C-alpha cells in the first residue's frame, strides 16, 4: 500500500471533530469489546493514543486515572480539551510519540493504528510507553471490512472507495515476537439508507483513501444507484467491520 498521507488523515478527522460523537457507534462498540478484554485492575496512568474528541479519555479520568490524550488532529485534541477529557494533551503521530519511555500503566488505542504506515512500528512505539507490568490494549480494522460499501460502488465504477486493511495473517506477522491475546470479531452497524451509512463514515473522519480519492462527485443519481446496489439486512443498509483486538502485558 502507498504511504499514508498523515496531513490528509489529520485534516479529515479535524473536519469531523465537532460532530464525531453523533456518528461513533462503531467506536463505542469496539471500545466496549476491548474494555471487556482488559485485566481487572486499576491503572494509575493512562495514555489514550488516537483519543479523538476524548470520550474514552474522560472515562479513564472519571475513574481516577491520570490521563494523557494523544491525537494527530489538533481539532480533535481541542475538542477533547473542551470536554476536559484528560490531564495532559499531546498532538503527535502514534509512530513517533514525543514522550519518554515506560510512563504508563495502560496504553489504550481504539481504531487508530489503521491510519499508520506500519502496524509493527505503531505497536512497538505504543509498547515503548509501558511501565513493566503495564498493559497495551488496541483495536484496528482488518481485511474485508466495509464489504457493503465496496459492493454498492461496484455498480457504478471500479475505483477504490474504501481502504484496504491488513489480513489476519499480515496482522499476526506484524505482531510476531510479541506475547498477548489477539482476537478477530465482526461488528455490523445498521443504517436507514445508503446516504446515512456514508454520512457516518464522513462523520467520524474515515473518508481519507490511502490510494487517493476517486474524482467523481456523488450526485443524486449515483446515490440512488448506491441505494439499489447496497446489500440489505432486514431493510437496513449495514456497514460491516472486522475488528482485530490485541491485549499485551509488558514484562
From Swiss-Prot:
GO molecular function, one term: S-adenosylmethionine-dependent methyltransferase activity
Top-level taxon of origin: Bacteria
Keyword Membrane applies: no
Keyword S-adenosyl-L-methionine: yes
E.C. no: 2.1.1.197
Name of one Pfam family that matches: Methyltransf_11
Pathway involvement of the protein, from the record: Cofactor biosynthesis; biotin biosynthesis
UniProt cross-references to CDD domains, sorted A to Z: AdoMet_MTases
Entry keyword set: Biotin biosynthesis, Methyltransferase, S-adenosyl-L-methionine, Transferase
Biological-process GO terms, alphabetical: biotin biosynthetic process; methylation
Reactions that this protein is recorded to catalyse: malonyl-[ACP] + S-adenosyl-L-methionine = malonyl-[ACP] methyl ester + S-adenosyl-L-homocysteine
PANTHER family cross-referenced by the UniProt entry: TRANS-ACONITATE 2-METHYLTRANSFERASE, TRANS-ACONITATE 2-METHYLTRANSFERASE-RELATED
Function comment: Converts the free carboxyl group of a malonyl-thioester to its methyl ester by transfer of a methyl group from S-adenosyl-L-methionine (SAM). It allows to synthesize pimeloyl-ACP via the fatty acid synthetic pathway.
Similarity remark: Belongs to the methyltransferase superfamily.
UniProt name for this protein: Malonyl-[acyl-carrier protein] O-methyltransferase
Organism of this sequence: Enterobacter lignolyticus (strain SCF1)
Amino acid at each position: 500500500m502507498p504511504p499514508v498521507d498523515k496531513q490528509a488523515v489529520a485534516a479529515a478527522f479535524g473536519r469531523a471533530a465537532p460532530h464525531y460523537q453523533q456518528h461513533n457507534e462503531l467506536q463505542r462498540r469496539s471500545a466496549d469489546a476491548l474494555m471487556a478484554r482488559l485485566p481487572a485492575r486499576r491503572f494509575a496512568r493512562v495514555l489514550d493514543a488516537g483519543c479523538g474528541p476524548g470520550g474514552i479519555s474522560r472515562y479513564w479520568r472519571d475513574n481516577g486515572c491520570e490521563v494523557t490524550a494523544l491525537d494527530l488532529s489538533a481539532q480533535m485534541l481541542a475538542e477533547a480539551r473542551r470536554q476536559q477529557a484528560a490531564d495532559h494533551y499531546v498532538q503527535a503521530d502514534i509512530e513517533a510519540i514525543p514522550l519518554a519511555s515506560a510512563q504508563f500503566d495502560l496504553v489504550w488505542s481504539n481504531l487508530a493504528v489503521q491510519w499508520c504506515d506500519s502496524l509493527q512500528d505503531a505497536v512497538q512505539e505504543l509498547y515503548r510507553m509501558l511501565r513493566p507490568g503495564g498493559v497495551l490494549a488496541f483495536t484496528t480494522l482488518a481485511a474485508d471490512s466495509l464489504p457493503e460499501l465496496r459492493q454498492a460502488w461496484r455498480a457504478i465504477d471500479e475505483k477504490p472507495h474504501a481502504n484496504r486493511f491488513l489480513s489476519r495473517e499480515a496482522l499476526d506477522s506484524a505482531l510476531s515476537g510479541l506475547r498477548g491475546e489477539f482476537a478477530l470479531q465482526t461488528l455490523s452497524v445498521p443504517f436507514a439508507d445508503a446516504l446515512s451509512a456514508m454520512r457516518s463514515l464522513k462523520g467520524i473522519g474515515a473518508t481519507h483513501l490511502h490510494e487517493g480519492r476517486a474524482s467523481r462527485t456523488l450526485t443524486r443519481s449515483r446515490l440512488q444507484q448506491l441505494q439499489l446496489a447496497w446489500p440489505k439486512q432486514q431493510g437496513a443498509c449495514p456497514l460491516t467491520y472486522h475488528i482485530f483486538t490485541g491485549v499485551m502485558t509488558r514484562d
